[in-house]
Amino acid sequence: MENSQVWLLWGALSVAVLFYLSTLRRRHAGGKPLPPGPTPLPLIGNLHLAGGTSFHHKLRDLARVHGPVMTLKLGLATNVVISSREAAIEAYTKYDRHLAARATPDTFRACGFADRSMVFIPSSDPRWKALRGIQGSHVFTPRGLAAVRPIRERKVGDLMAYLRAHAGEEVLLGQAMHTGLLNLVSFSYFSIDIVDMGSQMARDLREVVDDIISVVGKPNISDFYPFLRPLDLQGLRRWTTKRFNRVFSIMGDIIDRRLAHIRDNKPSHNDFLDSLLELMAAGKIDRVNVLDMLFEAFVAGADTMALTLEWVMAELLKNPGVMAKARAELRDVLGDKEVVEEADAARLPYLQAVLKEAMRLHPVGALLLPHFAVEDGVEVGGYAVPKGSTVLFNAWAIMRDPAAWERPDEFVPERFVERAPLLDFRGKDAEFMPFGSGRRLCPGLPLAERVMPFILASMLHTFEWKLPGGMTAEDVDVSEKFKSANVLAVPLKAVPVLIK
């Protein structure tokens, strides 16, 4: 190593130590103490507690010792972890505006994505308000969703056809649903099947999106020691930049083909891309906005819904009595109807309860997307949340809070039947919040709450589901593993048996 690099490293470490010592257990300028937490070690803080496969479990265990509002030092980054419904309500109702910015992983700074993405820019930014308004009024409106409902029904039909072709065989359910949902999302947005499609473009797009998802959950020294970001020591931002450039190039080709289609006065595809290009033509958004929206839908939409449905099926196979009850409801409501339609799901309250209970127990976004305190003055549980800190809502722990739920660690869908009007997906009382709450509520919720019960109803109405290899319900492993999302530690395998 050259002398200049050695001195740079030692200088960086010296600054880190001084900065660390200056922040140790100090009281906030307003007089309120910072939340309690585990004693940080020199330089690394509490990073030694962050390893393993179930970070959200560790945070819940630490909260039992230090309290529902807790400080965690990850390197030099101050994190405030909220783990109870009461504390979450206080944070969302009193300080939604103060906490409405996002803590941005350095990986997503590649290509300037975080500086313009609706996922990361602060909600106080006029661009965020404009983009959120466009999604709410042109993409995820009842009218817009109704327009592409035939596409969704056709793609769910394709998924059922795939499962029929493999009836009686062992199927990796997560993989099958991920494939089906990638096609549903891609066809809804720009009328192209991404999986099992002959074009090289489709295969390249699927591969690069999978690559980007895989890097999201990797620990990055740039996030723990922000002053080291310019060095990108692990090369993760450079690696991601190459993938971003590739995915934006592929999606740019899709946009160019559609624009040529429009110039030739060919019939409309009646998908989300047509709606976005109409807005672009009117000057309300630009090409980069369209690219970002398409990318966000791919990275978040299909993956989250597929993982959720895998969790639901795991709990149903582990609880055959619940599955029998859900299938009985389907028979009572649908009778001899062979094919489930999307609108049928609204008439299936117990099936909806099954979905919600699985999401309560196993939220895919166990820690939601991290918030960022943009100003001082935030107090939660009597403690100061300092400006510049990352705020983590442990949704997994909050939705298992014994102060809010009876038998919180058990799979009991009936609780959502009894309290259905009070427990929707919007997290208003922070008791049930798989999609977050407040102004940063997941914008794709209107699509997800239509698609997931529709697919679940189709799977249970079309097939009986068996376990492979002599397994019993007790053998189903619902252990969790946290990477970029909360996933099954053991991928779920099951055998679809066609109902005659």
Curated annotation (Swiss-Prot):
EC number(s) recorded for this UniProt protein: 1.14.14.112
In terms of InterPro entries, this protein maps to: Cyt_P450, Cyt_P450_CS, Cyt_P450_E_grp-I, Cyt_P450_sf
Tell me yes or no: is Phosphoprotein among this UniProt entry's keywords.
no
Q: Where are the transmembrane segments?
A: 4-24
Q: Which reaction does it catalyse?
A: ent-cassa-12,15-diene + reduced [NADPH--hemoprotein reductase] + O2 = ent-11beta-hydroxycassa-12,15-diene + oxidized [NADPH--hemoprotein reductase] + H2O + H(+)
Q: Name one GO cellular component term.
A: membrane
Cofactor annotation: heme
The UniProt keywords, alphabetically, are:
Heme, Iron, Membrane, Metal-binding, Monooxygenase, Oxidoreductase, Plant defense, Transmembrane, Transmembrane helix
Induction / repression: Up-regulated by methyl jasmonate.
Compartments reported by the entry: Membrane
A GO biological-process term: diterpene phytoalexin biosynthetic process
Detail which positions bind heme.
C442
- Main enzyme class: oxidoreductase
Instruction: Please report any disulfide bonds recorded for this protein chain, giving both cysteine positions.
Output: none
**What is the top-level taxon of the source organism?**
Eukaryota
What is this entry's stated membrane topology?
A: Single-pass membrane protein
Report the main location listed first in the record.
Answer: membrane
What residue range is the signal peptide? Answer: none
Q: Does the keyword Amino-acid biosynthesis apply?
A: no
* A GO molecular-function annotation: heme binding
Q: Which family does it belong to?
A: Belongs to the cytochrome P450 family.
Query: What PANTHER family does the record point to?
Result: CYTOCHROME P450 FAMILY PROTEIN, EXPRESSED (PTHR47950:SF48), CYTOCHROME P450, FAMILY 76, SUBFAMILY C, POLYPEPTIDE 5-RELATED (PTHR47950)
Its function?
Enzyme of the diterpenoid metabolism involved in the biosynthesis of antibacterial oryzalides such as phytocassane. Can use ent-cassadiene as substrate, but not C11-alpha-hydroxy-ent-cassadiene, ent-pimaradiene, ent-sandaracopimaradiene, ent-kaurene, ent-isokaurene, syn-pimaradiene, syn-stemarene, syn-stemodene.
- The name this protein goes by in its record: Ent-cassadiene C11-alpha-hydroxylase 1
Q: Which gene encodes it?
A: CYP76M7
